[in-house]
Design a protein with these regions (language model features):
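Gly/Pro-enriched, hydrophobic low-complexity segments
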Residues: 180-243
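Bacterial Sec-dependent N-terminal signal peptides
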Residues: 1-53
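Structural motif
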Residues: 174-175, 186
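Short beta-strand element of the conserved SAM-dependent methyltransferase core
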Residues: 34, 60, 182-184
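Extracellular or lumenal secretory-pathway regions
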Residues: 47-163, 168-171, 178, 192, ...
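Generic detector of intrinsically disordered, low-complexity, polar/charged segments
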Residues: 12-14, 32, 36, 45, ...
Length: 296
């Protein structure tokens, strides 16, 4: 329970803040303001199931090493909507893209934006590193993940496994909050987390939870995956919403966590043609890094 603690706010602008050309500004105003605010928001509400009101909205900068040989990293901004019992975790850019594509003619509009951003060398601003929406404690005692394998919408539900945290004495300040360190071996990686008892919600990014306070920062021991909070807000946090982006024809296919991870890593595709048919390309030969979960 959040209680009466005061949450200080460090707002992050919705877009990246990079300089844009006048043409880009006009296009973004037309598509985003008219298309998103007028058209997308009702669709988001219509295509989402409210679990409960959100107490907090936190944003994290995710960094992932996608080539362990060169050390190349990609980054993404992810949103954590935390309620009293449940939470939702997803990419800001993914939500924008899925919301836009759900509109009438949204697929065509999204392609136009992709072409525009590609010409300007800014395609990463419209793409996400993940297709996952992760819902903690929905249903009760479980974690549900909705994602896509290629173009196939899939869903799997797993027991909400509690990382076995060891609390440490180290302390540092993040966004003005005093945070303490904890460590845990979880899903094949050793994780370090920094949490604050000033915000007594036992949640965090991805599938990390179970500490005496909100997790502000987390990373694995190899620094291949990391999450750093960049903003926290208790004002107008909205709802913890379970989104349904299936188009009515392709409902979510139920899979297991292990099957999803094997498919995502390319192990289920015995040749490139099958992978191509699934819309994944030859992921088995292209992947140069380990998945976040290594216990599959």
């Amino acid at each position: 329970m959040l209680g009466t603690c005061t949450v200080r706010i460090s707002l992050l602008s919705f877009r990246s803040g990079k300089k844009t050309s006048p043409h880009s500004v006009i296009v973004l105003r037309t598509v985003f303001i008219i298309g998103f605010l007028v058209g997308t928001l009702p669709l988001v509400l219509a295509q989402g199931k409210t679990v409960e009101p959100a107490i907090l909205e936190c944003r994290y900068l995710e960094r992932v090493v996608v080539d362990t040989l060169s050390g190349r990293r990609v980054s993404d901004t992810l949103i954590l909507k935390a309620g009293r019992t449940a939470s939702a975790f997803y990419s800001k850019d993914l939500l924008f893209a899925d919301s836009l594509k759900a509109q009438p003619d949204g697929q065509q509009e999204f392609r136009r934006l992709m072409l525009l951003y590609a010409k300007e060398g800014r395609i990463s601003e419209l793409t996400s590193n993940t297709s996952e929406y992760i819902y903690q404690n929905w249903p009760d005692g479980c974690i549900t993940t909705r994602a896509k394998l290629g173009k196939e919408p899939v869903e799997f539900t797993e027991e909400r496994e509690l990382p076995k945290w060891t609390l440490r004495d180290s302390v540092k300040t993040i966004l003005g909050y005093e945070c303490r360190m904890a460590e845990a071996d979880f899903r094949g990686r050793k994780w370090v987390a920094w949490y604050s008892v000033e915000v007594p919600l036992s949640v965090g990014p991805w599938k990390l939870w179970g500490l005496p306070g909100l997790i502000f920062e987390a990373y694995d021991s190899r620094m291949e995956y990391s999450y750093s909070m960049v903003s926290i807000s208790a004002d107008s946090s909205g709802n913890v919403t379970v989104f349904d982006w299936s188009d009515g024809k392709k409902k979510y296919t139920k899979v297991t966590r292990q099957k999803y991870l094997r498919a995502y890593s390319g192990q289920d595709f015995v040749n490139a043609s099958k992978a191509k048919e699934a819309g994944l390309g030859n992921m088995a030969s292209e992947r140069k890094y380990d998945l976040r979960e290594k216990d599959y």
